Swiss-Prot record:
It is a multi-pass membrane protein. The system is composed of three essential subunits: KdpA, KdpB and KdpC. Keywords: Cell membrane, Ion transport, Membrane, Potassium, Potassium transport, Transmembrane, Transmembrane helix, Transport. The keyword Glycosyltransferase does not apply. It comes from the Bacteria. Pfam families: KdpA. It comes from Staphylococcus aureus (strain MRSA252). This is Potassium-transporting ATPase potassium-binding subunit 1. The chain crosses the membrane at residues 1-21, 66-86, 127-147, 166-186, 245-265, 281-301, 327-347, 354-374, 377-397, 416-436, 482-502, 531-551. Part of the high-affinity ATP-driven potassium transport (or Kdp) system, which catalyzes the hydrolysis of ATP coupled with the electrogenic transport of potassium into the cytoplasm. This subunit binds the extracellular potassium ions and delivers the ions to the membrane domain of KdpB through an intramembrane tunnel. One of its GO terms (molecular function) is potassium ion binding.
């Protein structure tokens, strides 16, 4: 019941909050202008931008340049961090390959961590590099999505200014909400301090070092921005990051808020005036929510069912291996599904200890990479499936392939197919390399089916810009650092470039009349068709390897 109430409440909050996002996205005046405008203008002066409207090509160039600059600075700081200030625990520099992986990971909103949070970075890099990139990577995804929506919906005839979009989103959305969430987490016991690690003497007389630091400030944007990188190695399974059931709900709600709101925002932009949400967006929301609930049901059923091998020995009950008692199997499964559906990557339990079908659920969500997804890019990926579904359905019934009065032609379909294929190609090719390259497979700590699942999960998490992992994998090696870094880089930027090309191409040949021979996108049967094509296309792509991994493991447990 608590899960049903929580999900219902989050849908309602996201619907209401999308109205505020609508004013932020379209640069409309609001009551908060007096608070934020001066700070925004100061940021624009520092950046040196004149807020001129950009073409799609210029917008992409500035997006890539901005991200490239941040990536270089991050890499340099990580390889010299031990010689900088705010390092009371005397943490060492990262190796070249690990710094490469870490910089790309946080730059692309993945937050895949091949280092221990306690010892891998200093307080300085944790706050200036990691926390800063959590804001900018999230805002970058939002900015390119809003640019795409402005053109697709025809609400404006401009794509916007990249720096204006990113600054407004950080100042008016991320910063206020992060401050509020940080305060709420501190009331639940999450630390926020610059003191060095605590050194205590245990009851047995041994010395123990307890790691803590400025955790609350990172924890808020970590979930709000669908980032996922933990201050501590145990991530949100540790009491300092996630002390109790209330902090658990706060963190889950933070992950869901903005991606859900983006879908409703799309609906408001389609309705032109923003006071209501267009039926097309509601159909998309219901379709994604249906897949979300289906995967959640599978995961919870599998975790509550427990391990059949133990059941045969007379040990009945839920699968509690790798889980925190304060959360139990139910809330652990919910957190797992949310963090992979919304591509956050934080964990409140160890995914490597999930049952075979319990691990299948989050893996499938990342393979789909379309069920709500991360900030902005999740909606962009969904629209690719919408265009693909429309094109196939239209040809099947002899109607004109058209979306929002814009004909879908051969040029757009080439880009759409490329976006669709990049994701599985990166996952499958690099997974195969992990078994072929000498030394790479030595990182696999489990034999047979589960070992394949470990590799597939790691590569899928990198390709989906998620960041969670089956942490039994020994991933801090040259192969895993470089390979996952390349995957994260390609899977982030190539689709974004192609998606903006698709939207610009559609708009340039926009038709201003409604053709009666087109598929209705605001009817329930379109939502059903979308679900069928998502499952069918992804199933044909990934079923063979899933049979070698979690499904094969499930069939062997008796």
């Amino acid at each position: 019941m608590e899960i049903i109430l929580f999900l219902t409440m989050m849908v309602m909050i996201a619907y209401v909050f999308s109205g505020y996002l609508y004013r932020v996205a379209l640069v409309q005046s609001s009551r908060v202008d007096l608070i934020f405008t001066r700070f925004e203008n100061m940021c624009f002066k520092i950046i040196g931008t004149d807020l001129e409207h950009m073409s799609a090509k210029t917008y992409v160039k500035h997006f890539l340049a901005f991200n490239g600059f941040m990536g270089v600075i991050t890499f340099v700081l990580l390889i010299v961090q031990q010689w900088l200030f705010l390092n009371p625990n005397h943490n060492l520099n990262q190796s070249i390959d690990l710094a490469f992986n870490t910089a790309i990971s946080f730059l692309t909103n993945s937050n895949l961590q091949h280092y221990n949070g306690e010892s891998g970075v200093t307080y300085l890099t944790q706050m200036i590099v990691m926390t800063y990139l959590m804001f900018t990577s999230s805002a970058s995804g939002y900015a390119v999505c809003i640019a795409m929506l402005r053109r697709l919906t025809g609400l404006t005839n401009i794509i916007g200014n990249f720096y204006q979009d990113i600054v407004r989103f950080i100042v008016r959305v991320l910063l206020p909400l992060s401050c509020l969430i940080s305060i709420l987490l501190m009331t639940q016991g999450v630390p926020q301090t610059l003191h060095a690690n605590l050194m205590i003497r245990t009851l047995s007389g041994h010395i123990q070092h307890i790691a803590f630091g400025p955790i609350a400030s990172l924890e808020s944007i970590k979930h709000l921005g669908t980032n996922g990188g933990g201050f501590l190695a145990g991530n949100s399974a540790t009491p300092f990051e996630n002390p109790n059931i209330w902090s658990n709900f706060i963190e889950m709600g933070s992950m869901m808020l903005l991606p859900m709101s983006m879908l409703f925002l799309f609906g408001r932009m389609l309705s032109r005036h923003g006071k209501r949400v267009h039926r097309h967006a509601l159909i998309l929301f219901v379709a994604m929510f249906f897949i979300f609930i289906a995967i959640l049901t599978l995961t919870m059923w599998s975790e509550y069912r427990g391990n059949p091998i133990l059941a045969n020995l007379g040990i009945h009950g839920a699968n509690m291996e790798g889980k925190e008692v304060r959360f139990g199997a139910g809330l652990s499964a919910l957190f797992t599904v949310i963090t992979t559906a919304f591509t956050t990557g934080s964990v409140n339990n160890m995914h490597d200890s999930l049952t075979p079908l319990g691990g299948l659920g989050p893996m499938v969500l990342m393979m789909l990479n379309v069920v709500f997804g991360g900030e902005g890019v999740g909606l962009m990926n969904l629209l690719i499936y919408v265009l693909l579904t429309l094109f196939i359905c239209s040809l099947m019934v002899g109607k004109t392939p058209e979306y929002l009065n814009m004909p879908i032609g051969a040029r757009e379909m080439k880009c759409i197919v490329l976006v669709f294929l990049i994701h599985p190609i990166l996952i499958l090719v690099f997974s195969a390399l992990a078994f072929m390259i000498p030394g790479a497979s030595e990182s696999i700590t489990n034999p047979s089916f589960h070992g394949i699942s470990q590799v597939m999960y790691e590569m899928t998490s990198a390709a989906a810009n998620n960041g969670s992992g089956f942490e039994g994998l020994k991933d801090d090696t040259t192969f895993w650092n470089i390979s996952t870094g390349i995957i994260m880089l390609l899977s982030r930027y190539i689709p974004i470039i192609l998606q903006l090309m698709i939207s610009s191409s559609l708009v340039n040949k926009k038709s201003y009349h409604q053709d009666k021979h087109t598929i209705a996108i605001d009817k329930p049967y379109f939502g059903v068709s979308l679900i069928v094509f998502i499952v069918l296309l992804s199933g044909l792509t990934f079923i063979p390897v899933l049979l070698l991994g979690p499904i094969g493991e499930f069939l062997t447990l008796k």
